[in-house]
């Protein structure tokens, strides 16, 4: 297979051909990416700096924030840089690295959200045993398993793609290297590979979605026997998580579970999935969480007092 591969680089089409639109993309996505990195860094620093945010929920939130920094960083900086050049070139090795990284951090994000749903289930449905069940060891295992599962998902996607023969053309109708556009360029029958790719990505998204739905149905049924104050806190916490789950899971479910056709909106859906959840997650989890907001205020007060000295 490898001997037939005479493609050393790929040409990315990007989002728009118009130079004016590309300049607009540069401004918008540069701003979005800076806000994403700063917002998630602020969440990580706040959680690690305040002793009041040491519960498992905030441990998983810091893990999610780290994944949310890394996920768009695999594609957006390259896309921003490409707005300055006419020919958007990426090497074969660079393409495979981008493919692996995007699926690694994107997959890990989904598994972390599943771990967070389990944490909320234990906290609400088994409150008396919560600290015993969700100890440091269990949290570390769940987080480690999420990152390992993301790695296994990504390495399968990458190995399936890298072993394909690419004889030309080498033009990818996308703004980054993803599996489906690359399968169309391979000079071999990719039917079985395509099925495995769909099963790998689509079923992970679908299975995670159903696990999360079942978890929250059980949580809602459990809330009926609790006080109105406990219900309010649980709905506030779980509501943030549900919004994030929908933002993260709906685009890949649409992309991989529907029949394999090319839609003009596909690139925009992928872009939404890469850019918007990492950008919005810090807002979603902080605006609805008084503990995080208070911790951030105290952190800024400490910074201000140190600056005055």
Swiss-Prot record:
InterPro entries: GPCR_Rhodpsn (IPR000276), GPCR_Rhodpsn_7TM (IPR017452), Olfact_rcpt (IPR000725), Olfactory_Receptors (IPR050427)
Pfam families, sorted: 7tm_4
Superkingdom in the source lineage: Eukaryota
PROSITE patterns on file: G_PROTEIN_RECEP_F1_1, G_PROTEIN_RECEP_F1_2
Primary localization: membrane
Subcellular location: Cell membrane
Entry membrane topology: Multi-pass membrane protein
Gene Ontology terms for molecular function: G protein-coupled receptor activity; olfactory receptor activity
CDD domains for this protein: 7tmA_OR4A-like (cd15939)
Annotated TM spans: 24-47, 56-77, 99-118, 138-156, 194-217, 234-256, 268-287
Keywords: Cell membrane, Disulfide bond, G-protein coupled receptor, Glycoprotein, Membrane, Olfaction, Receptor, Sensory transduction, Transducer, Transmembrane, Transmembrane helix
Disulfide bonds: 95-187
Glycosylation sites: 6
SUPFAM superfamilies: Family A G protein-coupled receptor-like (SSF81321)
Parts forming coiled coils: none
GO terms under cellular component: plasma membrane
Sequence ranges on the Extracellular membrane side: 1-23, 78-98, 157-193, 257-267
Protein family membership: Belongs to the G-protein coupled receptor 1 family.
Functional description taken from the UniProt entry: Odorant receptor.
Protein name as annotated: Olfactory receptor 4S1
The species this protein was found in: Homo sapiens
